[in-house]
């Protein structure tokens, strides 16, 4: 049941993706109708996700395939927030070893950051939701953390929901590294305030966040 009074009062709606609008390739019932109702009543919606494994372009393609109207400007990911944080804190001169997907690496390179493929060339470590994770990456991360280099993570989530259940997310891997190295990262994504603050920069209103 859609609460039309709530839709009328609110003008900006922020939606999480995995496990909120869809699970795997299955869109939840009522999602299309809800989003259409928001737009029809003069509201706007944006999509926020901690999932760093995909690019915005991949998310646009997925939602379009599921029948949801979406453009690249409708999205904010934890990689977007990470890039903003690195720029604000003088991170352009560092060389980053990335425990993340090739998509995450490509986004960082496109933003002007140096991604080191070898740990010997790195002087900072970035952790994401790495669906391409290998034991070699974990070993490299432990060695780098032992050297005391800066350490950041896209998000604190323990698990990511999938069509077949839950899988370990970035937070679980960071916990494993903490057990091995006693190092904890600076965490960027939700529920940290940075991502929402980036939305407020361009949307000066009180949104309704649905996760």
Mark where each language-model region is.
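Short, charged N-terminal beta->alpha structural module
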Residues: 88-111
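Asp-based phosphoryl-transfer active-site loop
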Residues: 9-27
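Substrate-recognition/cap helix-loop segment adjacent to the acidic, metal-dependent catalytic center
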Residues: 39, 55-74, 111, 147, ...
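Short acidic low-complexity segments
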Residues: 4-5, 112-123
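Conserved acidic, metal-coordinating active-site core of Asp-based
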Residues: 120-199
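A short, structured active-site edge motif that brings together acidic residues
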Residues: 71-81, 119-122, 156
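Substrate-recognition element of Asp-dependent hydrolases with the DxDx(T/V) motif
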Residues: 15, 35-61, 75, 94-101, ...
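Single conserved hydrophobic/aromatic residue that forms the stacking wall/gate
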Residues: 200-211
